[in-house]
């Protein structure tokens, strides 16, 4: 048994941790707002896997809008000992964004602002939820392009 005190929820086919507790979910709702805590199976399913197609449904998906909210979520996870998986676009092939230990997925969907574009110095400052497409569209206005892969 891991330090997260998890067990397999055979009914739902996923691990359960302290993140399933009503008090934890209530606190998560306080942090990010009720509409940004997803627990329905249909709503968490898109966050259960990546391009490899192996699925591990989380107990909840939390969609913070700021670094401060992420900090509060991680503080709660540390206090209550439930696992957290960070997730951007979920298009990787390595399983890094897959919640294999259950717990909570912290989705960066709402953290999608481009903070700064410096055409002279060739850098961009973004939040973690900015999509490649949005970034390409933004830098194109400066006569630049973003080549994400070799």
Which stretches of residues belong to each language-model region?
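Short glycine/serine/threonine-rich phosphate/pyrophosphate-binding segments
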Residues: 70, 93-94
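N-terminal beta-alpha lobe that positions the nucleotide/phosphoryl donor
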Residues: 24-25, 94-97, 122
């Amino acid at each position: 048994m891991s330090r997260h005190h998890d067990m397999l929820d055979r009914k739902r086919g996923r691990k359960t941790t302290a993140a399933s507790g009503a008090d934890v979910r209530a606190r998560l709702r306080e942090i990010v707002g009720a509409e940004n805590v997803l627990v329905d199976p249909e709503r968490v399913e898109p966050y259960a896997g990546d391009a490899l197609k192996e699925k591990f449904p989380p107990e909840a998906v939390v969609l913070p809008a700021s670094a401060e909210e992420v900090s509060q979520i991680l503080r709660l996870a540390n206090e209550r000992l439930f696992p957290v998986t960070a997730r951007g676009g979920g298009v990787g092939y390595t399983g890094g964004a897959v919640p294999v230990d259950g717990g909570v997925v912290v989705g960066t969907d709402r953290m999608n602002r481009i903070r700064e574009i410096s055409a002279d110095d060739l850098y961009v400052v973004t939040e973690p939820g900015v999509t490649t497409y949005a970034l390409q569209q933004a830098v194109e206005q400066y006569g630049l392009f973003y080549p994400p892969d070799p």
